[in-house]
Amino acid sequence: MRETQGLRGARRKAGRTPRVTLIPGDGVGPEVIGAAVKVIAAAGVKIDWDQQLAGATALRRFGSPVPDQLISSLRSTKVALKGPLETRVSEGYRSINVYLRKLFDLYANVRPVRTQAGVHTPFRGVNLIVIRENTEDLYAGIEHQVAPGVVESVKIITARASTRIARFAFDYACSNHRRMVTAIHKANIMKLSDGLFLRCAQRVARDYPDIEYREQIVDAACMRLVTDPMAFDVLLLENLYGDIVSDLCAGLVGGLGFVPGANYGRHGAIFETVHGTAPDIAGRGIANPVAAIKTGALLLDYLDHGADADRIRKAVSTVLRAGRVVTPDIGGKAKTTEMTAAVIRALR
């Protein structure tokens, strides 16, 4: 099943090979992104990859986590496949993921979350789409020390961004035959900021009478998600709540190693693994490549290779269902390269 039907992508031009920025990332990034590239090639899709460095790897080589050549490449291609990037806690450079999303106005973060046969999870039949506003909220990064021991952080919510992400969510629901959009909020406490977000969602919802619209307070939504996730369909969230809830949803289906991610704007997109750099297993060749391969499938959807993307997703499902050639985190003994080869065999 296609994950991104109806999204405006970089459509193919007859006879032209699409050019895509490739950012392997840090830690296990090169291993899992390499797997995705191999699977895309095995599916018969030709892509002109422009490989660039970012994050800690780029900092060591170029003295900057976001080198000029990376930005130039992204401005040219307007689409990227990206691995995980190192972000230190409470020190160092700011998140490169957040920086790139804001720089290119990639305002919609989308994570399809589905259970997979062969993956042990507490639930069956989970089929959620988490849509997160990507450009403001506390992630605007406006914070300062007021006095020693006192720090202030500013939450920015605008009608423009809230309306834009709400319309994206409803358009997505319509294009992908979804039945319901639930706006997740904390307007009982943050009456102005979250209240504005809700009012914008409510106004947009009136334009989509065929899509059911609901609202739920974020803490209650988290409780409901871990007890009855099938009660949800498309989740619409502000930036911070979306970051937290999307990881919670990944936990319902086996973890971040099974969930792809995408960031969409009007003029481009970055497709990324949502898991971390996993430095404890980097270089050991045992990283789970599923999230990266499925993220590659999202890229193909965007490039108007939807049939090939579906073939890749089916091949991944075949390998997981069989359970014979899977990495240690899934209960197997296979290397990343061995599991990738199994997906390619299933693809053919």
Predicted feature residues:
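N-terminal glycine-rich phosphate/adenylate-binding segment common to multiple enzyme folds
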Residues: R60-K155, L240
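N-terminal beta-loop-helix "entrance" segment that forms/cooperates
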Residues: K46-Q69, L225
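Glycine-rich phosphate/diphosphate-binding loop of Rossmann-like nucleotide-binding domains
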Residues: T21-A42, A147-D219, A231-D233
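Short glycine-rich or small-residue beta-strand-to-loop segments that form or flank ligand, phosphate
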Residues: R19-G25, A80-P84, V181-A187, K294-D301
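Buried hydrophobic packing segments
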Residues: A36, I40, A201, A292-L300, ...
